């Protein structure tokens, strides 16, 4: 299977051959779901914490006698049903990360890239750059590609491109080595230079 290629075309019409392993794999929904879920879970901070009745300061003395007051009996002013009391099921810091091995991660990335190709959401260009860090210039280029909400993948960091895209809420620029499954599926289109595609092919092929 490693010898097979997928034939794609750039916007200008040039033919590009890419590895079928990286850009032509059959979609595995369960695998992609597991990897994306694990990726999102790994981004959770997990530092929330609350105090139980045992941890809230005070409340050691019985607030009033057991009988004769007409009130419901109480043993502590830090009971969860009292204002200022502890939390019944106090939250604890938690590590939400999930283990995903390298083979699964690579497989999910291959599935996502192949699905982008099948859905015509992957836009290949010879190169993608702007002469100056101007948002207006970048927006015009994206509109020409019908890609207003796009992830731009380049083979190297382009300072002008990064600065031009910084003010656009639905546009992001990443290096080919920094793509992740969530970013690939979050945008309507993925605008990718041929050089970036070749770099990804080496990484995933």
From Swiss-Prot:
Keyword NAD carried by entry: no
Domain of life: Bacteria
Keyword annotations of the record: Ribonucleoprotein, Ribosomal protein, RNA-binding, rRNA-binding
Disulfide bonds: none
GO BP terms, alphabetized: translation
GO molecular function annotation: rRNA binding; structural constituent of ribosome
Organism expressing this protein natively: Acinetobacter baylyi (strain ATCC 33305 / BD413 / ADP1)
InterPro entries assigned to the protein according to its UniProt record, in alphabetical order: Ribosomal_uL4, Ribosomal_uL4-like, Ribosomal_uL4_dom_sf
Chain segments carrying region Disordered: 47-70
Family assignment from sequence similarity: Belongs to the universal ribosomal protein uL4 family.
Any matching Pfam family: Ribosomal_L4
Gene behind this protein: rplD
Keyword Iron-sulfur found: no
Protein name: Large ribosomal subunit protein uL4
Subunit structure: Part of the 50S ribosomal subunit.
GO-annotated cellular components: ribonucleoprotein complex; ribosome
SUPFAM superfamilies the UniProt entry points to: Ribosomal protein L4
Role this protein plays: One of the primary rRNA binding proteins, this protein initially binds near the 5'-end of the 23S rRNA. It is important during the early stages of 50S assembly. It makes multiple contacts with different domains of the 23S rRNA in the assembled 50S subunit and ribosome.
């Amino acid at each position: 299977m490693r010898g097979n290629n997928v034939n794609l075309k750039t916007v200008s019409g040039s033919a590009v051959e890419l590895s079928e392993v990286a850009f032509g794999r059959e979609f595995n929904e369960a695998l992609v779901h597991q990897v994306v879920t694990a990726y999102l879970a790994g981004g959770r901070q997990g530092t929330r914490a609350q105090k139980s009745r045992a941890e809230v300061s005070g409340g050691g003395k019985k607030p009033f006698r057991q009988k004769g007051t007409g009130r419901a009996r109480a043993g502590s002013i830090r009971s969860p049903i009292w204002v200022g009391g502890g939390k019944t099921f106090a939250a604890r810091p938690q590590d939400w990360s999930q283990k995903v091995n390298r083979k699964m991660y690579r497989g999910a990335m291959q599935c996502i890239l192949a699905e982008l190709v099948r859905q015509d959401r992957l836009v290949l260009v010879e190169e993608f750059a702007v002469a100056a860090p101007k948002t207006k210039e970048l927006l015009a280029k994206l509109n020409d590609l019908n890609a207003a909400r796009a992830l731009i993948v380049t083979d190297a960091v382009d300072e002008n491109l990064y600065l031009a895209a910084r003010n656009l809420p639905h546009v992001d620029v990443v290096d080919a080595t920094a793509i992740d499954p969530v970013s690939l599926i979050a945008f309507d289109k993925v605008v990718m230079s041929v050089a970036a595609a070749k770099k990804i092919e080496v990484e995933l092929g």
